[in-house]
């Protein structure tokens, strides 16, 4: 997943991600759009919310189409920063609804922590990534395998992007 974020120092920041994947072996196409908005309360703390829409479609004999929506508010704590690197934790919870064609929708939630890293490229741009998830998920759209507590370091839990600071 790629993410782009614009940020105002001690103010509003905007961002988002987009992903697109085509698997020819199983005729699967998937994409997601995840806009993000937040507010820097101080140099250490920010609050924000991520919205998400995800679609997966399987072609062929067993054509299946799924759609998911999610809303995930969070608090961001930056615990280390020097001239180039900033380390942070996004702590929050998310609510999702997941619908497969011709099947009832499934509602889910997650609560947990996503660690992140920002590397300053110049005065305005930073490379930013979030790697992993630690917490609890109950039928959340990124993990439809049921309920569980743990740590996830798969491709669904890694985002990479650029941040712009005004």
Walk through the language-model features, giving the residues of each.
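Individual transmembrane alpha-helices with interfacial aromatic-anchor signatures
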Residues: 147-156
